[in-house]
């Protein structure tokens, strides 16, 4: 094992070319920590928000004029193998294949340290490292939106707006696993993909406006966030639930949070329930997701794979907003 490892860091906010692949000291592990040799990671919209410092709210968290130490790293998903464990670690041993994530980011690196009680569990044997690394953040978001916020039940009609992206591909599959009748909204090139994930109906938004079909849904998982709130409410049943997961980065100061704020204000005065949230990583939900993966009720969808040396290109591609499933980094 060498004394240095390669990792992605950045010292200023800006486009993908601010990212550097640097040599850093090997992470030290404490008595309750695990050293993981990262084999694959993935990128998420939150990565480019932090990279660019946009919306401005991000800078209040990460540093105003430039990212502070600890906030200048990217990547929240990973899969790899255990290299070493602290003396108090009983759950893992060297050689174990694991997957999970880091709340504080930093998985775009050759090695990371993780607490044994952190968001890390054994990798499903039926997945490659690349497939496993594509799962955590997107699957957590879809799971928590459907199960916790929408409280979806078997037989309900669920519409997923943005069905072909990272979160959307998991949302379609999980909604089906929960017994819902699922409609996915996507563009023409992705219709077959969304249908293959189990969607009962697919709406091609380039030829049909899903807000004007006259159909009503019990649950709308709005990942794209590309329609006016009044339009999305129109497709909900009178007591339906709209869960806002994301949306375009409109507004310099708080970006998509402005839409979330409008939902919070409006929800108490209408019969429909309008919910917005930010997903949180936790070990219990990772175990739930792992079971769905092992039983093949859910499968990861990977659009493109890039090496660690091409993270800038990967995030640039993700920023374009047309990824089919996840964008993965091999390490």
Residue ranges and their predicted role:
Residues 97, 157, 181, 240-241:
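Short glycine-centered segments of the SAM/dcSAM-binding site in methyltransferase folds
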């Amino acid at each position: 094992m060498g004394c240095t490892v390669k990792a992605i860091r950045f010292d200023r906010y800006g486009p993908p070319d601010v990212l550097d692949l640097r040599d850093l000291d090997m992470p030290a592990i404490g008595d309750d920590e695990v050293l993981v040799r990262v084999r694959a990671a993935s990128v998420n919209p939150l990565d480019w928000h932090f990279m660019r410092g946009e919306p401005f709210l991000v800078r209040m968290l990460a540093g105003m004029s430039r990212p502070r130490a600890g906030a200048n790293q990217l990547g929240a998903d990973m899969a790899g193998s255990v290299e070493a464990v602290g003396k108090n670690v009983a759950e893992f041993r060297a050689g174990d294949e694991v997957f999970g994530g880091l709340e504080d980011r930093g998985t775009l690196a050759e090695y990371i340290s993780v607490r044994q009680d952190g968001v890390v569990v054994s990798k499903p044997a039926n997945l490659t490292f690349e497939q496993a690394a594509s799962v955590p953040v997107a699957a957590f978001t879809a799971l928590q939106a459907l199960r916790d916020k929408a409280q979806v039940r078997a037989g309900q009609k669920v519409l997923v707006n943005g069905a072909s992206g990272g979160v959307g591909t998991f949302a379609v599959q999980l909604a089906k696993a929960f017994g819902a009748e699922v409609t996915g909204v996507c563009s023409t090139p992705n219709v077959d993909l969304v249908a293959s994930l189990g969607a009962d109906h697919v709406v091609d938004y380039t030829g049909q406006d899903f807000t004007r079909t006259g159909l009503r849904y019990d649950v709308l998982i709005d990942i794209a966030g590309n329609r006016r709130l009044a339009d999305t409410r129109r497709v909900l049943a009178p007591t339906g639930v709209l869960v806002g997961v994301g949306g375009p980065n409109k507004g310099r100061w708080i970006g998509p949070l402005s839409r979330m704020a409008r939902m919070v204000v409006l929800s108490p005065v209408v019969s429909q329930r309008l919910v917005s949230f930010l997903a949180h990583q936790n070990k219990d939900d990772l175990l739930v997701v792992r079971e769905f993966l092992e039983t093949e009720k859910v499968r990861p969808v990977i659009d493109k794979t890039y090496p660690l040396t091409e993270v800038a290109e990967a995030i640039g591609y993700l920023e374009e907003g047309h990824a089919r499933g996840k964008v993965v980094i091999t390490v």
